[in-house]
């Protein structure tokens, strides 16, 4: 996890960008040009990470929801790792699992510092690979979890998720497949949305405040929609790295959320509107370093934004390379 260190660099003036994105128009004017669609993009995510890693590199991926019809994953990712001094290539590796495990790990860090210690039920909205790695991370830091609720779009992915839980998660005693968001969210201690986001904010998965259990942690590596009054006035807003959202706000000027599709950009939209103050958005690093309190009561609802940083990919990719070399 990035914990406020100068020993890292990412693309952009603030050294905290998610990366450089290629997207396509809604109405292409040239033959053969792709058309805008849900999660259709290319992304380059370069970074340098110091400390014990001393590694430069880049994750590159293409994403298209239509891949599923061809039996391919939505995103297909590669990672290049380079010597930080010479630039010589050290490894070119598939990065699908690297990316999924690093994405799952960050909600796990959030649960470690923000979830109630007596959490027993977790909800996964989107039973794909990212939902699985998030669940594994939650189980590693919340040993009292015994029930997982899951909502998905198709029976095939739901069945695969159930089989995964039976095989890999022995502490889970019950898997509940839910037909609605309300059923999935109610009575859960941890709610995690990992589903593919639609293009328009109005179509993002909706979570009503009165469905959310007091004291719940809502982890959002993907998009969700809430009532403004709840987000502004009745939840703690935590982000994985505030500067990441500042960089997004520069790249995608207000309103940013519909384009970025990570809830931290909704927070910066509120900041732009003057509806919240900067101090209302808390960096997880400040909680880890004890500069800011984490959970302040058993009834506090916390919304945790997970944007994803290239330095995390370099850290985990570099670790995998180290184990391979050994």
Regions found by a protein language model. Give the residues of each.
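A glycine-rich, Thr/Ser-enriched phosphate-binding loop motif common to dinucleotide/cofactor-binding enzymes
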Residues: 93-112
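N-terminal entrance/gating region of PLP-dependent enzymes' catalytic architecture
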Residues: 14-78, 84-90
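Short acidic low-complexity segments
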Residues: 173-188, 205-207
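NAD(P)-binding Rossmann-fold cofactor-contacting core
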Residues: 143-165
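Glycine-rich adenosine-cofactor-binding loop
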Residues: 107, 119-139, 152-153
């Amino acid at each position: 996890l990035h914990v406020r260190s100068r020993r890292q660099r990412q693309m952009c003036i603030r050294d905290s960008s998610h990366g450089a994105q290629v997207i396509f128009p809604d109405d292409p004017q040239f033959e053969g040009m792709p058309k805008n669609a849900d999660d259709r993009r290319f992304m380059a995510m370069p970074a340098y990470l110091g400390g014990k890693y001393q590694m430069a590199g880049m994750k590159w991926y293409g994403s298209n929801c239509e891949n599923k019809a061809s039996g391919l994953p939505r995103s297909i990712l590669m990672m290049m790792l380079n010597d930080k001094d010479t630039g010589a290539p050290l490894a070119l590796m598939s990065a699908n699992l690297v990316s999924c495990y690093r994405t799952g790990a960050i909600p796990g860090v959030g649960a470690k510092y923000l979830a109630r210690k007596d959490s027993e039920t977790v909800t996964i909205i989107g039973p794909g690979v990212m939902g699985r790695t998030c669940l594994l991370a939650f189980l590693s830091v919340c040993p009292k979890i015994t029930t997982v609720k899951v909502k998905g779009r198709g029976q095939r992915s739901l069945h695969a998720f159930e089989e995964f839980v039976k095989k890999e998660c022995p502490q889970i005693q019950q898997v509940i497949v839910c037909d609605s968001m309300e059923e999935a969210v109610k009575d859960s201690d941890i709610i995690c949305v990992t589903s593919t986001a639609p293009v328009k904010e109005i179509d993002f998965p909706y979570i009503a405040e009165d469905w959310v259990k007091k004291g719940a942690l809502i982890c959002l590596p993907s998009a969700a929609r809430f009532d403004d009054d709840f987000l502004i006035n009745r939840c703690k807003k935590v982000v994985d790295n505030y500067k990441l959202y500042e960089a997004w706000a520069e790249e995608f000027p207000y309103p940013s959320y519909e384009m970025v599709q990570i809830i931290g950009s909704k927070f910066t939209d509120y900041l732009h509107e003057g509806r919240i103050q900067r101090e209302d958005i808390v960096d997880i690093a400040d909680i880890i370093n004890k500069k800011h309190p984490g959970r302040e009561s058993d009834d506090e609802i916390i919304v945790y934004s997970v944007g994803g940083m290239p330095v995390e990919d370099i850290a985990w990719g570099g670790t995998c390379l180290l184990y391979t070399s050994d």
